[in-house]
Structure formats: C-alpha cells, structure tokens
Amino acid sequence: VKGGAGPRRHELQGGSVEAQPLPSKRRRQVAVIGSGRIELDSELGRLAEEVGRRLAEGGVTVVCGGLGGVMEAVARGAADAGGEVIGIVSGDSAEEANPFCTHVVATGIGHARNLAVVSSGDAVIAVGGEWGTLSEIGFARALGRPVVALRSWTLKGEGPMESAPGIVPAASAEDAVAAALEAIG
C-alpha cells in the first residue's frame, strides 16, 4: 500500500492485520524477534535463517536485536542473500553486534531496546522466544504493529485455538514471511 490513502485491513488465516502506508522512498522493514539463547544449527535457528533469507529476497530490511541466537540466525540468512540488517543492540558499543548486521544502533539502554526493535519494524515476526520476546510482542501490539508468530507466543483469543487479535500464527518460515509482507502491503 505504498503511498496509499490510509490503512487497509487484511484477513489472514488465524487473524487479521492492518496494512499501513509507507513513505514512497523507504524500504519495508520487518523486525524479527526471538531467543538469544538458541543454537544457530537448531531447528529454530534454521527457521530464523530462512526467514531472514526470504525477507532479503523480497527486498525487505531486517531489524533485530543484533546479538546471538534468533537474532544472529535471521541476520545471517538476510546477509547471505545480500540483504540489509539493522541490529539494535542493548549495550553502548556497536562491537557487541553479531557479524551479519550491516547497520548497528548501539542504544546503551538494556532491555528497553526491545521497544526500539519492534517500533522500527512495519511488522514483527516472532521465532520461538522467551520472556523478552513476549515483552516485544506486547510492545508491538500496543503500537498496532502486526505480529506473526512462528513457533512463538500467540496468546489466547476468545476461542480455545484462537490467537489474540493482531497475532497471526504461521506454520513455516515461508508462511511467516508471506503473512508479514501481506500485512504491510
């Protein structure tokens, strides 16, 4: 919905999200969040890497927390596909970022950087995750950002198998990226 007149609602499997218009010269950005404690060669690591690759192939800039685990895996996938990765790190040195980040923002604000990560994305994809990921999902929804959950927190909607409004579950990296891109138009 580049240069559109306003937000558009998209109905997706498992929920709906609202697409926001983007300024015409800005690349789309998707924040990818998840645990910093996973191994890169684990199943979640491989999923995150595929998410990064697919986003980069779609011309999307990846935003992440810039450290290890899911953040490093998604950055590696995007960088290997020639994409750009913005790592927003919690410390005050760009040197702490993983080697796949093409741009680093050193915040020096600890976990508060979680808000900066999700507010920098037009949509958010959560891959696995722990308590920090849950906080990022909460921030994203409070900001009105669509969230796609890939083996992550979906929270409870009204029915026993429903996710909370604005959180769309995805079964694969391909589905997660497709849902995020559909949400941002």
Give the location of each predicted region.
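N-terminal amphipathic/basic-hydrophobic helices that include classical n-h-c signal peptides
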Residues: 1-16
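Generic N-terminal amphipathic, Lys/Arg-enriched alpha-helix
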Residues: 26-41, 58
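Acidic/glycine-enriched connector segments
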Residues: 46-56, 68-143, 151-162
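Short active-site oxyanion
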Residues: 59-62, 124, 165-166
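General beta-strand structural signal in soluble alpha/beta enzymes
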Residues: 63-65, 87-88, 169
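Short acidic-hydrophobic, aromatic-tinged amphipathic segments that line or gate anion-handling sites
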Residues: 104-108, 166-176
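A charged, well-structured terminal subsegment
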Residues: 123-124, 170-185
